[in-house]
C-alpha cells in the first residue's frame, strides 16, 4: 500500500465525482494523481460550465477551476495551498451560482449542525448566517472586517471540527471570488 501514490501521501483515495461530471461516480485513485487528470480524463469533463469545486465535504476547501491544474491528490499539497482535501468528495459549483449564496448555505449548515457547546460555534455560525441573510434581502451589506474577525474567532475558538473548519471554504471563496461578491460587501475603514 505504501508503495502506491507518492512519498507525502501514500496509498489510494476514494474520490467521489458529482453529477456535473460526464462520468460521475466513486473512483479509487492513487494519491499524487493530478486533479486535472481526475477531472478531465476519469471524470470526463463537465456537463455544464463550473467555476469551483468544494472538495472534501462541507468542511473542505473551495477550489476555483483555475487552480485545478496546479493541484495533485495530496493532503499536504491541498493544505499548503489553503484548501482541505478531507474525504475527497467533489461538489461542483456552477458558473452562474452566487458565491454569496454558497457562503450563506455553509453558515446555515454550521448553524443548524453546531452542537452549541461553545460560543464561537453556536453564535458565530448564526451571526455569519444572519449577515448573509441581510445581504440576500438587501437590508444590509456584509462588513468585511467583521466577517474576517468572525472567521478567525471561529477557527481559533471553536471546540469542534465542524465550526472550527467551516471558515476554510468561506475564506477560499473570499480570496478567489471576492470581486464577484463586492456588491454584497462593505469595506471597513
Predicted features along the sequence, with ranges:
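Redox cofactor-anchoring modules in respiratory/redox and cofactor-processing assemblies
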Residues: 1-189
Amino acid at each position: 500500500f505504501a508503495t502506491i501514490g507518492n512519498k507525502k501521501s501514500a496509498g489510494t483515495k476514494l474520490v467521489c465525482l458529482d453529477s456535473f461530471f460526464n462520468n460521475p461516480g466513486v473512483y479509487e485513485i492513487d494519491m499524487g494523481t493530478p486533479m486535472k487528470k481526475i477531472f478531465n480524463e476519469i471524470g470526463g469533463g463537465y456537463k455544464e460550465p463550473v467555476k469551483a469545486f468544494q472538495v472534501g465535504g462541507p468542511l473542505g476547501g473551495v477550489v476555483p477551476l483555475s487552480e485545478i491544474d496546479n493541484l495533485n491528490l495530496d493532503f499536504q499539497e491541498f493544505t499548503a495551498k489553503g484548501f482541505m482535501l478531507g474525504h475527497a468528495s467533489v461538489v461542483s459549483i456552477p458558473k452562474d451560482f452566487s458565491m454569496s449564496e454558497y457562503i450563506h448555505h455553509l453558515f446555515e449548515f454550521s448553524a443548524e449542525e453546531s452542537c452549541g457547546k461553545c460560543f464561537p460555534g453556536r453564535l458565530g455560525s448564526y451571526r455569519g448566517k444572519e449577515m448573509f441573510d441581510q445581504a440576500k434581502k438587501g437590508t444590509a451589506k456584509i462588513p468585511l472586517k467583521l466577517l474576517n474577525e468572525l472567521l478567525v474567532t471561529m477557527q481559533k475558538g471553536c471546540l469542534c471540527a465542524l465550526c472550527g473548519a467551516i471558515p476554510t471554504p468561506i475564506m477560499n471563496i473570499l480570496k478567489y471570488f471576492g470581486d464577484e461578491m463586492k456588491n454584497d460587501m462593505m469595506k471597513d475603514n
